[in-house]
Amino acid sequence: MGSEMCIRDRYAKKDNRIIVIHQKNAGVSVARNNGIKEAKTEWITFVDPDDWVEPTHVSTLYNAQKKNRDMDIFLFDYIQEFDGKTIVKHLKSDSGILDEEWVHNLRIAPFNFLVVNGKPYEYETNVIWNKMYRTSLLKDNDMWFVPKARKGQDVIFNAECLQLTDKYFYIHKALYHYRYLQESVTNRFNEKAQYYNEVAFENYERIINKFLLSEEYWNAYYARVVTRLYSCMRLYYFHPDNKKDKNTTYTELDDTLDKYPYCDALKKVDGSCLTKSQKVFVYFLKKRNYGMLKFLVDGRIWLKNIKGARLK
C-alpha cells in the first residue's frame, strides 16, 4: 500500500486535477463519501481496488455524456475476470437511452434481481463500478453510502439513487474488468454477515417508504430477505471456518427465522419473485431442513466455481 500511495501522490503533484485523500481506514463507504464530497467534476465513477478499466474508459464516458447532456446516469458493460478465462457481460444489444420498461427493471433490481422479458437476467445492475453518475444528482439529493453497511453498500446506494431520475443511458461497450477472487472479502468467513444483511434490510424499507414505492417493490424485498439467508449460510452458518457445533448452529438459525424481518418475509414471499433454485431453497427454509440447506449451499458453491459465476 505504501508504494501505491507514493505513486498516487506523485501524480497529484504533477496534475492538480488529481486529489489524494489520506485517512484512517474507516471502511469503503466512508472513503467513497469523502471522495464524493471532494469531487469538483461534473461526473463520478468508481473503481474497486482489485479491478481495472479499459484505456478508453474515461474517454468513452466523456464522449457519451457530451452527446447526451440531459442524462443523469450512464451504464456500461464489463468483463468478468477469472483464472484462465474471461466473460463479457452485455446489458442489451445496442447503445442508447433506456426506455420506461428498462428504467423500471433497473430500479427494482436492487431489491431482488434484474428481470428482462419476465425472466431473471444475469447482469451486475446493483454495483456502482459499471456506472457513471452526475455529481449534482448525488450531492443535491444527499446521496451517500451507508457507513454501517460494510457489505453490499453498492446495492443500497443504487436502490435509492436509481429512484432519483429516469434519465439513464446505456453504452454497449465493455469498459470495466471485474476480477473474481476466490479468497476475496466477499467469500471469507464473516461472523457479521447476517448483521450486514439486516443493515441493508433497514435501508431497503426506508427507501420503499421514502419514495412510496408500490407493492411490487415490497414483494421483491421479501424475496431478497429470505434469499439473502443463503449468503448468511455460505459466509457464516455453514462456512468451514465456523467452529460451532451443528446443534448450536441450528439453534441460531431457528432464532433467526423466528424474528423480524425473516418471519414476516417467509409468510409474505411471492413465489413469482423467486427463481427455480430459490423456490427450492425457500421450501426447505420454511421446513427448517438445515441439513438439506447445507447441501444446497455447498452444491451451489461448487457449481458456481465450475461455471465461473460470481457468488451472491
Placement of each model-derived feature along the sequence:
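Short aromatic/hydrophobic "clamp" motif used to bind/position activated sugar donors
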Residues: 44
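Donor-binding/catalytic cores of nucleotide-activated saccharide
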Residues: 28, 49-168, 176-192
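Short, conserved SAM-binding/catalytic segment
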Residues: 9-15, 64
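Short, conserved active-site loop motifs that form the nucleotide-linked donor/cofactor pocket
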Residues: 17-19
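Glycine-rich, basic loop-to-helix element that forms the pyrophosphate-binding segment
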Residues: 23-39
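Short, small-residue-biased leader/transition segments that mark boundaries at the very start
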Residues: 1-7
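Catalytic core of nucleotide-sugar-dependent glycosyltransferases
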Residues: 173-181, 187-215, 228-262
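Membrane-interface aromatic/basic loop that binds lipid-linked glycans or pyrophosphate carriers
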Residues: 238-312
